[in-house]
């Protein structure tokens, strides 16, 4: 197609696979390819394409500030398949991140011999032990490592894979961005930003988040001439352009905001110091160059902190949900609202009652068995009211779902209202195993993955997917995928230092000649800088990059249809992850994995967790098998 880079060009002579994106998924695909081959296999060339650091990828680059931390715990992430995994190629046992840290410290007698042997055969770069000395010494399984340290782990895994490649696999590294893909008969021609071309018999796109084109409001923001920090991952945003010493408006109170908060306080020389007299437990000592944040979001309330258990989080029983999944697995047109949500909600309230009975048994005014009978007989939206007369500490999940809805006070009053709730959030998170509220919320949070698997590939009704399911997934994100506790303590310390204020939920924006104005209910605030501290979901229908537009224009992808309604994800074939054309035919060579396919496949943003048969590693294994099948056909 003229002008799109999708035209037809001449032939090719050698079998080759192109992996676009050399972060965790790209690494895993290379390892899964290697697991399927040996020195005597027919030779192939694998082109490794990414303008970011190969192995780490953009998000986990090792040269970034150590101020930013993972949202995942050290003992809950791996990149190696494990014995018993649902994969076709042989397993390569390797240390999870925390075991790798233990081995760096000279510990790990309880780590399996196979993992220790792999580590000893491939010792990490010597600078890691020195550069991360303090962090390595302090890290526990439940710690949140710096993103840079996780990048070092990924780079080590990548180096292990490269070193262990059979002689039949040769690799070529390209440190450039893919711009377009053209079909040339039986091959793909990938044009890179540096002007080079890669010719491939099979291609996989494993590139993570892709930014869509600006919507109408964002086009106005871009044309305003004012200081607007557009939505993106914080490592891609120009946080240095956020001015210190003046008001800054923010939209977003999730992980993106917490990153921006850290980068404009700690990274600029401010300090959070322990202070037992402060309600957050911290006192902020300003550097003078931090912004004065005025913050809003869809809910208007900050993401909740993760609990501190002193160990990895517990696995909740969720007995009702497990029963529902066993009954409904694979069934089309499941109504999430009517058939799944009641089990999730009742499991959550059972977790509350069970923990309350354990830590404060006198709080139950009726026997636990009687309360559970009421839970099972009550509409899920009425559970809080139903159990209230039976306990001395009533709790209603609805209060958290709509924490500031209808609040009519001014910014000062709302800020204090939220600050008091944050103080409670901090207290509950610090209680760990002994918080009934956190037990209830963790039960709901852990229900998200199995519920999303149950409804994958459009198995939930369209109405329930866009309704209750979407609501529950969003709420679960806020209560279960929030920051480490220390980040929420830091935000409350900023509130008490007069440097963070809350505007409210569902803000509306107006653009004036010299400032922006955000309004939420009766509250409004103006400033010359607006930070959008969130990320849009990738959407191939409104792609902001030439490569995705090229694929759409050339008919190599189509939106995944959810009950006839197009979504933002490219549709892919389950067994192979090959893309689907508008006419329903599978593409001969092109594969897409990971985050962009969120509408069709579950759990696309979650790192592989040890002991869970991670879906990401199942996907990369399937994809590697298909890539080899394509080049050998």
Question: Model-derived features: where do they sit?
Answer:
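Redox-cofactor-proximal catalytic regions of oxidoreductases
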Residues: 54-132
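Flavin (primarily FAD) cofactor-binding/catalytic cores of flavoenzymes
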Residues: 2-65, 133-631
């Amino acid at each position: 197609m003229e002008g799109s880079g999708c035209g037809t060009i001449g032939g090719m002579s050698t079998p080759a696979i192109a992996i676009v994106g050399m972060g965790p998924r790209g690494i895993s695909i290379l390892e899964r390819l290697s697991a399927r081959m040996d020195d005597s296999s027919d030779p192939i060339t694998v082109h490794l394409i990414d303008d970011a650091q190969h192995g780490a990828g953009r998000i986990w680059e090792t040269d970034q500030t150590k101020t930013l931390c993972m949202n995942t715990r050290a003992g809950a992430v791996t990149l190696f398949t494990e014995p018993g995994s649902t994969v076709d190629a042989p397993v390569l046992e390797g240390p999870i991140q925390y075991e790798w840290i233990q081995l760096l410290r000279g510990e790990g007698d309880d780590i399996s011999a196979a993992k220790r042997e792999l580590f000893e055969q491939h010792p990490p770069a010597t600078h890691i032990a020195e550069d991360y000395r303090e962090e390595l010494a302090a890290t526990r399984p439940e710690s949140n490592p710096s993103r840079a340290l996780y990048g070092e782990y990924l780079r080590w895994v990548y180096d292990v894979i490269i070193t262990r490649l059979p002689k039949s696999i040769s690799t070529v590294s390209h440190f450039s961005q893919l711009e377009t893909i053209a079909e040339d008969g039986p091959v793909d021609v990938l044009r890179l930003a540096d002007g080079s071309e890669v010719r491939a018999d099979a291609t996989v796109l494993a590139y993570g988040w892709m930014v869509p084109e600006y919507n109408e409001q964002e086009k106005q923001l871009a044309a305003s001439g004012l200081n607007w920090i557009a939505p993106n991952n914080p490592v891609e945003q120009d946080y240095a352009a956020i001015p210190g010493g003046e008001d800054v408006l923010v939209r977003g109170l999730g992980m993106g905001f917490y990153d921006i908060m850290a980068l404009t306080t700690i990274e600029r020389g401010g300090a959070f110091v322990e202070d037992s007299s402060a309600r957050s437990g911290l006192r902020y000592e300003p550097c003078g160059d931090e912004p004065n944040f005025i913050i809003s979001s869809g809910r208007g309330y900050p993401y909740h902190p993760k609990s501190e258990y002193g160990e990895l989080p517990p696995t909740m029983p969720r007995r009702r949900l497990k029963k529902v999944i066993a009954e409904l697995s694979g069934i089309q047109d499941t109504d999430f609202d009517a058939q799944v949500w009641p089990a999730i909600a009742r499991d959550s309230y059972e977790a509350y009652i069970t923990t309350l009975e354990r830590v404060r048994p006198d709080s139950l005014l009726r026997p636990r068995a009687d309360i559970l009978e009421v839970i099972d007989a009550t509409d899920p939206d009425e559970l809080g009211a139903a159990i209230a007369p039976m306990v001395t500490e009533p709790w209603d999940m609805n209060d958290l779902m709509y924490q500031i809805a209808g609040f009519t006070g001014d910014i000062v009053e709302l800020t204090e209202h939220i600050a008091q709730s944050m103080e409670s959030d901090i207290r509950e998170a610090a209680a760990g195993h002994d918080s009934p509220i956190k037990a209830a919320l963790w039960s709901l949070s852990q229900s998200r993955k199995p519920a999303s698997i149950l409804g994958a590939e459009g198995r939930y009704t369209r109405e329930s997917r866009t309704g209750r399911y979407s609501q529950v997934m969003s709420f679960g994100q806020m209560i279960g995928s929030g920051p480490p506790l220390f980040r929420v303590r830091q935000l409350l310390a900023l509130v008490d230092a007069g440097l963070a204020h809350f505007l409210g939920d569902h803000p509306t924006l107006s653009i004036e000649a010299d400032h922006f104005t955000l309004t939420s209910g009766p509250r409004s605030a103006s400033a010359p800088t607006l930070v959008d501290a969130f990320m849009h979901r990738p959407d191939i229908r409104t792609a902001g990059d030439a490569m995705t537009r090229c694929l759409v224009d050339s008919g190599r992808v189509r939106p995944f249809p959810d009950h006839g309604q197009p979504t933002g994800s490219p549709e892919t074939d389950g067994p192979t992850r090959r893309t689907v054309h508008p006419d329903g035919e599978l593409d001969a060579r092109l594969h897409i994995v990971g985050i962009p396919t969120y509408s069709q496949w579950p759990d696309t943003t979650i790192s592989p967790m040890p002991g869970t048969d991670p879906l990401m590693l199942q996907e990369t294994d399937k994809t590697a098998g298909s890539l080899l099948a394509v080049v050998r056909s």
